[in-house]
Every structure is written in structure tokens, then in C-alpha cells.
């Protein structure tokens, strides 16, 4: 149950300002680490600002959702929601300058398949990236290297409560206890659209799954010109608790505002920021512990040396071919 979950205790926050502080702190910690390494100066223009990191996170989160939407075999919505939540949680406390979101997003999807028991083999998973066996092998190698890091950074809190189950529950409840609405299924399509849009915002980190699901249904009803206040007051028994009803309505309004004010990253801005990001991950600046460790094994002859062609980094272009 959500109310007894690690999600409620550790991953549901009080405000957007709190989320912004956590992200700014992750940005600051990386800057301090890079400066302490003697590789850059404190005000080096190579660094990304917190709002620039957020733009890149938005971009790669959208890429994650696109990847999941065309995945073969079809990926259940619960798996997609779990992967999305992992990605959001990871970059609350980590910087894209240290851990590249391109591989983190795939690792989130890979781990979500396991946790939600979506039976996909490793070759099947990377087979969704591109046809080149070398590209698939390289991607899988990186995913497996980052999987434990991801689990650790999630504090081993791997169970995610998504809004999809309560959403179906509310539809069943409407069919059973709210005869005023003859066909609740007419709300599904627009409500699904709302859930897809709100998944791109921080709502999953701020509100409960049932609040998100109920807001999706009521927003759909509102767009269809259907008034459902009596459902809240009668069926959900909020008539006698006006304070609770008022709070719920305020929460719903806040969620709708999140969706309205969401701005997708502009392609020209993303292109510039990706260049800065690649500079952060270049050999002379990269502080990625996993990369260093792998290089150390190679130096100690634990890992066979690879040809220059095999060492080429897996890139965004490899993902484009799968979409």
C-alpha cells in the first residue's frame, strides 16, 4: 500500500522548491568534486547550470518514454511509469555532468522490467536499440555496469506505486456507484492523455498515485462538460469534511497547473547543452567512477584490450534508429 511505502516516506516531497534545492545541491556537489580534482576552475564555463541540467533531464526523460512506447514486446504502462520514476529520483541527487542520462535512462528501463516482472531477456532488451550486434553489446555492457549504481542511488527503494492501478479502480467505482455517469469509459482517452502529460512533470514526486489518477478523471470529465462534484461529495464521502474536499480541489488545481506550465525542451537549446554535456564527459574532465574502474581493470590486464573501433562510445544516434 502506498501509505506504508518507501515512496511515501522517502520519495514524496512537499514542494517544487524542495525539488529545486535538491537538484541545485547535486549540481554544486559535482562542481566541488571537479574543482577539487584540479581539472577545472570554479567558474569554468564547461559547467552546466541547474536549469540547464533540468532541460537535459526533460529531453532524456522524453526519449525514455519514446523508447518505451515502441518497445517490442509491448511494455506495460506500470513498467514505463516505474522507469520514469527511477529516472526522476536518480537525478534529484546526481548530476548529468557525472552520470550521462543517455545510459541512465536505459538502465532505468532495464531495471524496471525486472522489478515489475516484465519478462524480457537482455538480448531482447538491447535488440530494441539498433540492429548492429556491436552496438547492442556495447549498450548492454554499459547498462549492466550502471545497474548496481542505480539501485544504490535509489536507496534500494525499487517498488513504485503508479497512478494506473488507482485510475482503473476509480473507473470501476464510477461504473458501480455513480449511475449519473452512464458510460465512464468515455473519460478514458482524455484521462490517459492527461496521465501521459503529467508523467513529464514532477507530479510523481509531489502527489499520491490516487490523487494523480482522480485528477486525470476529473480533468477528463471537465473537458467533456461533465460535472462530477457530487461524486466527490457523495461517493467519496467528502460532503461532511469540507476541509478535506477543499484541500483535494487545491491539489487537483496545482496538478493541472503543472501540466499547463510544462515547457518541452527546445531542440536548438538541447543541441547546445548536449555539446556542453559531452565536454563534461570527455576524458580530461570525466569523474565517472565506473568508467575509471573499468579503465583500471584494463590497465591491470583483467579486461582484454579493445580495438579503437570497439571502444567507441554508444551515442544518441544509436537510439534514434530504434524510434
UniProtKB/Swiss-Prot annotation:
Single GO molecular function: cyclin-dependent protein serine/threonine kinase regulator activity
Alphabetically ordered keywords of this record: Cell cycle, Cyclin, Nucleus, Phosphoprotein, Transcription, Transcription regulation
Compositional bias per record (Acidic residues), positions renumbered to this chain: 312-323
A GO cellular-component term linked to this record: transcription factor TFIIK complex
Positions of post-translational Phosphoserine modification: 5, 132, 322
SMART domains associated with the record: CYCLIN
In-chain residues carrying the UniProt-annotated modification Phosphothreonine: 315
One record GO biological process: DNA-templated transcription
Domain of life: Eukaryota
Chief localization: nucleus
Pfam families: Cyclin_C_2, Cyclin_N
Annotated stretches, region: Disordered: 299-323
Biased composition (Basic and acidic residues): 302-311
Localization: Nucleus
Keyword Cell cycle annotated: yes
Function: Regulates CDK7, the catalytic subunit of the CDK-activating kinase (CAK) enzymatic complex. CAK activates the cyclin-associated kinases CDK1, CDK2, CDK4 and CDK6 by threonine phosphorylation. CAK complexed to the core-TFIIH basal transcription factor activates RNA polymerase II by serine phosphorylation of the repetitive C-terminal domain (CTD) of its large subunit (POLR2A), allowing its escape from the promoter and elongation of the transcripts. Involved in cell cycle control and in RNA transcription by RNA polymerase II. Its expression and activity are constant throughout the cell cycle.
Subunit structure: Associates primarily with CDK7 and MAT1 to form the CAK complex. CAK can further associate with the core-TFIIH to form the TFIIH basal transcription factor.
Protein family per UniProt: Belongs to the cyclin family. Cyclin C subfamily.
Protein name in UniProt: Cyclin-H
